[in-house]
């Protein structure tokens, strides 16, 4: 506590007891989670040695665990907590307390925590499993955008540094978040009106960036509404709203409406809590006016800020998968994008086939695809996949029920042979020049193939060895292995 400089946060994990070394003895222990630890004394030490640090734990006392390790807060997230009813490692904490309580006795805001990798510590075999940009964006919007702070873990590698793959993804996240909020809809020329105003706390205060200025309707007047007339059509897909939390968290439910082409109000979103910050990701919405309505609140609402943004599309190449039966499907990084592809390796940007639905591809082909933003006309970087002959006629001859997982082209499934071998009937004579092996991708791996022999047969009885070898670094780099016959 005294050799690290100033510490921002002291983090007390809820896990305790279990198997480990206790005073030199390697044994398993179970502890009374409620009374075993001297939390008052421990907190006193932190306050003395690091007075500016916040303390994290199930019960805080300053910030609390959000109740999962996915990095997501909840659609309803209160910063208040029944703190005195909770202790570290409490079995029912995640279900009962982690989203906070409307009438909680203490201010203990949520902190979402998640690792940028599958685990909290560094392992070389996870270097290719760093979270994708879409995953990281989901984490951001479902934590920061849901009245929570975010702790994003970066395991330190054996050099004492954060791995370059992790840094690359973090930089992408930072750049995309900045881009999302760079196109703010200017409200200075808009006409703002409110259902009521309380003295100096007028609706125009919403245009000020300071938290201390806010709009406050007259006491007891709910629903309370703010109407924003842009004066002309605007397009947005992000909505941000904040309460002045120095006066507490109050809003229990709110809605966002837009004025449609017929001049009628149409509901765009219905949500619950706001807190320090609530961000909604919305479909591309074009309108000339918006209505923000607070339907329920613990006390007269104090709204410090609201804003609209037109975030550019996350323009990534499609994620492409083909199943055992040769059915090819595309997954786009964001709604509203289009995809184009070719099956001969040619540039799909010009003359490519528009992807509408999954399609059958049985024969070998070089599929090249791009995503397109129809609004800007911009294309993503291309993705190229060399598909071999589909496995539609293949059959695994091993007797185990799950043997078919060996060839199902689903990276999330796996098969372990009790005989350390597998035989596959290709359904017909085929000319092959090699094979690929995709190792198990579970967090805790077993059954990795290190040494191998590969045989072929024309009748299933007489076998000839085609190739043998070793997957040298498979434990540290469990990526697809490609072997060519000589």
Regions found by a protein language model. Name each.
Residues 357-365:
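Solvent-exposed segments in extracellular or luminal domains encompassing
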Residues 1-222, 228, 232, 240-242, ...:
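Mature catalytic domains of secreted/periplasmic carbohydrate-active enzymes
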Residues 240, 291-293, 368-372:
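Extracellular recognition modules
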Residues 283-295, 486:
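Noncatalytic modules at the cell exterior or secretory-pathway interfaces
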Residues 171-233, 242-250, 270, 276, ...:
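Disordered, acidic Ser/Thr/Pro-rich linker "stalks" and the adjacent N-terminal cap
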Residues 298-300, 374-382:
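Short, exposed coil/turn segments at beta-strand boundaries within extracellular/luminal domains
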Residues 325-332:
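A short beta-strand segment in extracellular, disulfide-stabilized domains
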């Amino acid at each position: 506590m005294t050799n690290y400089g100033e510490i921002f946060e002291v983090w007390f994990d809820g896990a305790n007891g279990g198997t480990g070394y206790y005073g030199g003895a390697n044994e398993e222990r179970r502890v009374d989670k409620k009374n075993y630890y001297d939390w008052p004394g421990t907190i006193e030490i932190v306050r003395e040695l690091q007075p500016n640090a916040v303390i994290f734990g199930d019960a805080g006392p300053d910030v609390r665990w959000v109740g999962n390790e996915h990095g997501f807060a909840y659609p309803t997230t209160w910063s208040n907590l029944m703190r005195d009813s909770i202790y570290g490692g409490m079995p029912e904490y995640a279900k009962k307390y982690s989203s906070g309580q409307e009438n909680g006795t203490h201010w203990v805001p949520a902190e979402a925590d998640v690792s940028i990798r599958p685990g909290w510590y560094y392992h070389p075999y996870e270097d290719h499993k760093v979270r994708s940009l879409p995953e990281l964006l989901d984490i951001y919007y479902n934590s920061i955008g849901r009245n929570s702070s975010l702790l994003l873990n970066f395991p330190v590698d054996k050099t004492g540094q954060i791995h370059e793959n992790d840094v690359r993804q973090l930089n992408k996240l930072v750049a995309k978040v900045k881009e999302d909020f760079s196109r703010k809809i200017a409200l200075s020329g808009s006409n703002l009106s409110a259902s009521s105003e309380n003295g100096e706390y007028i609706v125009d205060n919403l245009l000020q960036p300071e938290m201390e200025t806010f709009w406050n309707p007259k006491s007891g007047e709910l629903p309370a509404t703010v109407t924003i007339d842009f004066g002309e059509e605007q397009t947005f897909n992000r909505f941000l709203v904040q309460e002045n939390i120095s006066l507490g968290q109050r809003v229990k439910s709110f809605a966002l409406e837009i004025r449609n082409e017929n001049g009628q109000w149409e509901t765009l979103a219905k949500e619950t809590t706001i807190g320090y910050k609530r961000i909604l990701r919305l479909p591309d919405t074009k309108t000339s006016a918006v209505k923000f309505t607070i339907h329920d609140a613990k006390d007269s609402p104090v709204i410090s800020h609201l804003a609209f943004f037109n975030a550019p599309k996350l323009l990534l190449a499609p994620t492409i998968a083909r199943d055992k039966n040769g059915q090819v499907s595309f997954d786009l990084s964001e709604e509203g994008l289009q995809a184009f592809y070719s099956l001969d390796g040619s540039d799909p940007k010009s003359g490519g086939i528009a992807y509408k639905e999954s399609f059958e591809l049985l024969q070998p082909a070089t599929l090249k695809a791009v995503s397109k933003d129809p609004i800007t006309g911009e294309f993503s970087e291309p993705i190229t996949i060399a598909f071999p002959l589909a496995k539609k006629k293949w059959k695994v001859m091993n007797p185990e029920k799950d043997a078919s997982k060996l060839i199902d082209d689903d990276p999330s499934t796996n098969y372990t042979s009790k005989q350390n071998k597998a035989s596959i009937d290709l359904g017909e004579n085929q000319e092959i020049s090699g094979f690929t092996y995709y190792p198990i991708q579970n967090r805790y791996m077993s059954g990795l193939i290190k040494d191998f022999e590969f045989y072929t047969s024309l009748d299933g009885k007489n076998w000839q060895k085609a190739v043998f070898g070793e997957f040298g670094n498979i434990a540290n780099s469990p990526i697809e292995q490609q072997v060519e016959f000589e």
